[in-house]
Design a protein with these regions (language model features):
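Short, glycine-anchored, charge-dense loop/turn motifs used at functional sites
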Residues: 70-77
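Short loop/turn motifs at secondary-structure junctions and domain boundaries
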Residues: 56-61
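Short beta->alpha transition motifs characteristic of CBS
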Residues: 77-84
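A short, polar/charged loop-to-alpha-helix boundary motif
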Residues: 84-98
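Short beta-strand scaffold segments in enzyme catalytic cores
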Residues: 63-70
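Zinc-dependent deaminase
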Residues: 18-55, 119, 135-232
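Mobile, glycine- and charge-enriched loop segments
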Residues: 100-127, 217-232
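Fungal secretory targeting signals
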Residues: 1-17
């Protein structure tokens, strides 16, 4: 029964009528914010994708990667990706926040110091955050939130998503204390969009030299890392 529901859910997503997600066009291409050149944004979004590939391989189905950046020292502090652990909250953003929390704790920082640190850091994610992660970003009080692919793009490509934009989450968080996080959307989408285009659309090419193979689990072809396929 559960399997039938999953299959029906996927079919419904692929066959759904077009829906425009309100306030999801926040294109900040070329924008200079907080003194950071746009070229630096592109550099760190590429590093976000690279962090994903290191942790999850060249074509993970859940291609969500995140890094946390200190622009003052020009360095990546922590990274994360979506992991299947059974914990439904471990999205890339939460994974990276957890990694930084553990790192800061090991450095001897107090809880108060850790809370204060988020306001000096920028979180980069290669796809727009779901409402849960966007809320976590605002609760943390990050200095900046920078994302690539939009929720609208992923909805159009058949992903099951919550159709609430980060913009609207942020609009409802204005009363939170602390830093009002700067949001920069749709950075380097020409490189992030392809990572999310192939999962439910067999006409889309595989990223990073992966190849399509039929998936018994999903009932259609998905992209596979050819170096991970055992030789016969």
């Amino acid at each position: 029964m559960l399997k039938s529901l999953i299959i029906l859910g996927g079919a419904a997503a692929l066959g759904a009528a077009h829906f425009t997600i309100p306030n999801d066009d926040q294109n900040m291409t070329g924008i200079v914010a907080n003194g950071v050149p746009y070229a630096k944004r592109v550099e760190y979004m590429r590093k976000t994708n690279e962090a994903l590939f290191r942790q999850s391989g060249p074509c993970p189905f859940a291609a969500y990667g995140t890094i946390i950046v200190n622009h003052t020292s020009d360095e990546v502090v922590c990274e994360g990706a979506n992991f299947r652990t059974g914990d439904p909250t471990i999205h890339g953003e939460i994974s990276a926040i957890n990694a930084c929390t553990a790192k800061f704790t090991e450095m001897g920082m107090t809880a108060t110091q850790i809370f204060a640190a988020w306001g000096q850091l920028s979180i980069y994610t290669n796809a727009e955050s779901c409402p849960m992660c966007a809320s976590a970003i605002r609760w943390a009080g990050f200095k900046e939130y920078v994302y690539g692919t939009t929720i609208q793009h992923n909805y159009n490509k058949g992903w099951g998503v919550m159709t609430l934009s980060s913009y609207d989450v942020f609009q409802q968080s204005r009363q939170l204390p602390g830093y009002q996080t700067v949001m920069l959307g749709q950075i380097l989408t020409n490189e992030t969009d392809p990572l999310f285009s192939w999962q439910y659309d067999e006409s889309e090419p595989c990223p990073n030299s992966c190849v399509r193979q039929f998936s018994q689990t999903r009932g259609y072809s998905t992209c596979t890392n050819i170096t991970a396929i055992p030789s016969m």
